Amino acid sequence: MNPQKWEQAPWIGITTAYKAGKQILEFCYIQAIETAGGIPLIIPIVKSTDALQTLTAGLDGLVIVGGPAITLGLVGDLPDDINLTDPMRIGSDKNVLELFIECEKPILGICYGMQLLNAQAGGKLYADIERQVPGALNHSHIRGAGLHSIEIKPGSRLHRIMGINHLEVNTMHIQAIAELGEGFHATAAAPDGVIEAIEHRNGRFMGVQFHPERMLDCMQPLFDDFIRFCH
């Protein structure tokens, strides 16, 4: 045990899902942050922006976890096999995201989290990849998708972290980025051109469309880098 290590560790806020009156968070998110050397703190869903500001003031970084559909910046109509995000969650997530953006504290958006990060910056989202992207792969595990490859842009932060040009990732989404938000650029894509990772020009905001927390045997370096960034 090294108490001094944890005294110096960054505090990382993690958002949650919300269903049937309960906040839900998969343990793998906690595990990934702790293994990387960060102290995970679950952010409650609250309506008051003042309360959120007080709560998050001492945090060093933010992870926005996966979730259901987003209507912010939506292009097209949502299909029947995707659920909408609860208004309480989306409201709280947008507020906490805005607080971190204003302070330019490090942000890692995962799946829904990447889409929200992009939409908050004025970007657009496809409602249904398979209907709107010509030649699209099946990206939804609900529709039977498994793994697919992504091509990582050389020189990007993601490329520096992973050290490779191609990577096999899981895929659990029906929506995808249609148009990048202000300040963002794509750093990875699937074979059909669907954006799989984004980074902001300030170097502090990053999003991935896949779920690295469910592939920690090969994706832990992503969280390790995020924690180093939060120091």
Regions picked out by a protein language model, each given a short descriptive name:
Residues 1-108, 119-120, 126, 130-162, ...:
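N-terminal beta1-alpha1 cap of cysteine-dependent amidohydrolase-like domains
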Residues 167, 184, 205:
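Short, conserved active-site loop motifs that form the nucleotide-linked donor/cofactor pocket
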Residues 206-210:
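Active-site-proximal beta-strand elements of phosphoester/diester hydrolases
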Residues 168-174, 198:
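Short catalytic/ligand-gating loop segments at beta-alpha or beta-beta junctions
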Residues 111, 173, 211:
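Active-site glycine-centered loops adjacent to acidic/histidine catalytic or metal-binding residues
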Residues 112-114, 121:
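Active-site loop->helix "elbow" adjoining a glycine-rich segment at hydrolase catalytic centers
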